[in-house]
C-alpha cells in the first residue's frame, strides 16, 4: 500500500518541479480522464500560478488488461500552439496511451509537451516515451487501485493506493 501522506508528499514534489520548469509561462494541463482526475486536482492545487486545464479521454483497458488499442473518446478542445503542455496521467504501463496523446499533440505546435504521472511501471513499457514527472515506480505485476485508479470503475475514491488481491 502507498498511503495518503506518501502520495501527498510526491504530489507536492512534482508540483514544485513543474512550477520551476514552467517559470514565465502559463502552462496547459491535459488531464487524461477518468483515472487522472484525483491526481490532477491535487497536483493543480499545489501549483500557485496561472494555468489552464483541459480534459481528454482515452481508453485502453478492460478489467485488469490493456486491450492493446487506444481509443480517443474525448479529444483536445483548445489551442495549445506555442504553449507548454503537461499531460497528467494516473498510471503509465505500456506507454501506448501517452504515445497516442503525443501523436495527437504533434500537429498542434505546442512549445513543449511533457508527461506527469502518479505511477509508472517501467518494466511494462513498450514505447519510447520520456516521463518527465513521475511519482512512484511499481512492479509490472502489481495491479493497483485507489486515488483515481480503478478496477472496472470501482476504487477510484479510495484515498490510498492498494495492490489488488488476485
Residue ranges and their predicted role:
Residues 1-166:
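PRPP-associated nucleotide enzymes
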Amino acid at each position: 500500500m502507498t498511503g495518503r501522506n506518501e502520495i501527498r508528499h510526491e504530489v507536492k514534489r512534482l508540483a514544485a518541479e513543474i512550477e520551476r520548469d514552467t517559470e514565465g509561462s502559463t502552462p496547459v494541463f491535459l488531464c487524461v480522464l477518468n483515472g487522472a482526475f484525483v491526481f490532477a486536482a491535487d497536483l493543480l492545487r499545489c501549483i500557485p500560478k496561472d494555468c489552464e486545464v483541459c480534459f481528454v479521454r482515452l481508453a485502453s483497458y478492460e478489467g485488469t488488461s490493456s486491450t492493446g488499442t487506444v481509443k480517443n473518446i474525448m479529444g483536445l478542445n483548445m489551442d495549445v500552439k506555442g504553449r507548454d503542455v503537461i499531460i497528467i496521467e494516473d498510471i503509465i504501463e505500456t506507454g501506448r496511451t501517452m504515445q497516442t496523446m503525443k501523436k495527437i499533440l504533434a500537429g498542434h505546435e505546442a512549445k513543449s509537451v511533457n508527461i506527469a504521472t502518479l505511477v509508472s511501471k517501467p518494466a511494462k513499457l513498450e514505447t519510447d516515451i520520456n516521463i518527465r514527472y513521475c511519482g512512484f515506480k511499481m512492479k509490472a505485476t502489481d495491479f493497483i487501485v485507489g486515488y483515481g485508479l480503478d478496477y472496472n470503475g470501482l476504487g477510484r475514491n479510495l484515498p490510498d493506493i492498494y495492490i489488488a488481491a488476485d
